[in-house]
Amino acid sequence: MSEIALRLQDVHVAYGNSQQPVLSGFSMSVRKGEIACLLGASGCGKTTVLRAVAGFERLQCGEIYVSERRIAGPGVHLPPEKRHVGMVFQEYALFPHLTAQQNVAFGLRRMPREAQQARVTELLKMVELHSHANHYPHELSGGQQQRIALARALAPHPEILLLDEPFSSLDKRTRERLGNEVRDILRAAGQTALLVTHSEHEAQLMADHIGFVKMGQYQLKKAAHHSQG
């Protein structure tokens, strides 16, 4: 049986002084190397799951573990930079004044320069944008920007990669193509990932398993039916 890479146990999250929690008794797990997906309507709490795992939201109760290391729970709230978690956002969040390779290198500033450059080159080749290394974000298409954002998130070798509706701003044809590309990149890297989407087609395209989120709770898990060939 493969190792559990991410585990949420009885997680409760509420915003501000709200008496109604966004997440209520939320529990789930993701195995190492698996691409899991949370599927649900807007406002169901699925993005809050990512924010809680990333360290952007504090838990009212419950626990979160990454590779059996507790990162959140009673008396514990590791800051985002110490969680070994990467995140790809809807809006890419690239730095406009940095080139593609500088964006990818941003989280590697403590790495020796030679090793940093080798890692950046490896990732730019992986996302097939090595020839665009010196391009600025405004010189790249939406799909290319998202691949650079993916490379940047993968650069520091995160234990878990979180993807929050990563293709929602793209047209249908580009979403389909990029979904296939990102899935293949994650598999090639052996990367454990948790994707959030409201699109069942996108979930089926990318994920090994799909969990449904309703009213802040994890409802059901099923295997996706996409071909891995």
Residue ranges of each PLM-predicted region?
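A short, proline-enriched helix->beta-strand linker immediately N-terminal to the Walker B motif
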Residues: 155-159
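Catalytic Walker B motif of ABC-type/P-loop ATPase nucleotide-binding domains
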Residues: 161-165
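Conserved ABC ATPase signature
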Residues: 136-140, 144-146
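Conserved H-loop
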Residues: 190-198
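Short coil-to-helix segment of the ABC ATPase nucleotide-binding domain corresponding to the Q-loop/switch region
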Residues: 98-105
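Conserved ABC ATPase "signature" region
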Residues: 69-72, 114-132, 183-184
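ABC ATPase NBD coupling module
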Residues: 70-86, 110, 117
